[in-house]
Amino acid sequence: MSEQESRDNAAVDAVRQKYGFGFSWLVLMIALPPLVYYLWICVTYYQGELVFTSDAAAWRRFWSHVAPPTWHAAGLYAAWFLGQAALQVWAPGPTVQGMKLPDGSRLDYRMNGIFSFLFTLAVVFGLVTMGWLDATVLYDQLGPLLTVVNIFTFVFAGFLYFWGLNGKQWERPTGRPFYDYFMGTALNPRIGSLDLKLFCEARPGMIFWLLMNLSMAAKQYELHGTVTVPMLLVVGFQSFYLIDYFIHEEAVLTTWDIKHEKFGWMLCWGDLVWLPFTYTLQAQYLVHHTHDLPVWGIIAIVALNLAGYAIFRGANIQKHHFRRDPNRIVWGKPAKYIKTKQGSLLLTSGWWGIARHMNYFGDLMIALSWCLPAAFGSPIPYFHIVYFTILLLHREKRDDAMCLAKYGEDWLQYRKKVPWRIVPKIY
């Protein structure tokens, strides 16, 4: 390992200590599963109203809606998870190398997400068309599925914990069993060529998210004889986002989660439970709320989504092209940048000269456009934008600390050159 790589790894460790979870990991592991149930129950049984009461009997009635697991739901999810794993391993797609690991090695990854995504949609469409699968099954089984997937992730995280106990030197657990269960004990656990972390990061959670949305739309049609414009907007926006994700799937290999986080309960539960069951809250709400939107409102929401996407994808593409060719023209002019003592180049042109994370700003615009079609009858469809804002604010601070530890004075110079963090002129 080079001296520079050693410094980079030390910077990662320092940032992880400062921006990790401290003792809050236990609170998260205890509180988050009930929170997802709470949101689902409020949407499904209380018309989207947030339920707060001091009456013990009312709380018992509320929590009595928690659905027990069923063999139907368990069978559905087992078939789903194993089927997606098979596609990850055997579906056609290019093989690329990941980022350097702490020991200097690189792993191979098969990037076949877009094939798996489209193949899955084709199979599900065929099964529904032939009458072998009910289009509303995921909505009808949503409660039991939530319980099944929760149970599965807790068990799976236990498997991952024991899997990594004999890992490489730089993967050693902390010696605190419950914390290691939460954070993980292995960086890249694999079964043969199946990289469990990369697989769970996208396939069983993100594609499931889309199928759940489609099931919500089918349920709305079954109940009301129509699929409303708000439902079409939500499903359309999120489908486009997922297609874009899988087209650019290789970019996930450069993310913090893949490069630095071990694979434990936190990522496992977040990928398999949090993502599909909370990112579908807008569609869940719209199943029983069939309001219309004015034409100007539809135009404004579509414009917000497209503008957010243009900023999000445009910023990411600019940085990707700059890394490949620093002499590339950005917005009609030669790229401007700061060269660090380590030799890295910090782009200060284009979107990256407006704010340090304009891609986050675009992502937040997209997230808000997913919520607005639900109108303002309930705060629950807006849970996503609140959570996502908190997430990106934390991530920006973590990234800033990481770059300061890595680049020192050069990063301070970059801060002066580009003072705004996410939102130009505001933050």
Swiss-Prot record:
InterPro entries: ERG24_DHCR-like (IPR001171), Sterol_reductase_CS (IPR018083). It is a multi-pass membrane protein. NADP(+) binds at K319, R323, L347, W352, N359, Y360, D399, C403, L404, A405, K406, Y407, Y414. It is found in: Cell inner membrane. Residues 47-70, 132-141, 219-226, 284-291, 378 are periplasmic. The chain crosses the membrane at residues 26-46, 71-91, 111-131, 142-162, 198-218, 227-247, 263-283, 292-312, 357-377, 379-399. GO terms for cellular component: plasma membrane. Pathway: Steroid biosynthesis; zymosterol biosynthesis; zymosterol from lanosterol. It is an enzyme of class 1 (oxidoreductase). Residues 1-25, 92-110, 163-197, 248-262, 313-356, 400-427 are cytoplasmic. GO terms for biological process: ergosterol biosynthetic process; sterol biosynthetic process. GO terms for molecular function: Delta14-sterol reductase activity; NADP binding. It catalyses: 4,4-dimethyl-5alpha-cholesta-8,24-dien-3beta-ol + NADP(+) = 4,4-dimethyl-5alpha-cholesta-8,14,24-trien-3beta-ol + NADPH + H(+). Belongs to the ERG4/ERG24 family. Reduces the C14=C15 double bond of 4,4-dimethyl-cholesta-8,14,24-trienol to produce 4,4-dimethyl-cholesta-8,24-dienol. Complements the deletion of the Delta(14)-sterol reductase gene ERG24 in yeast. This is Delta(14)-sterol reductase. The gene is erg.
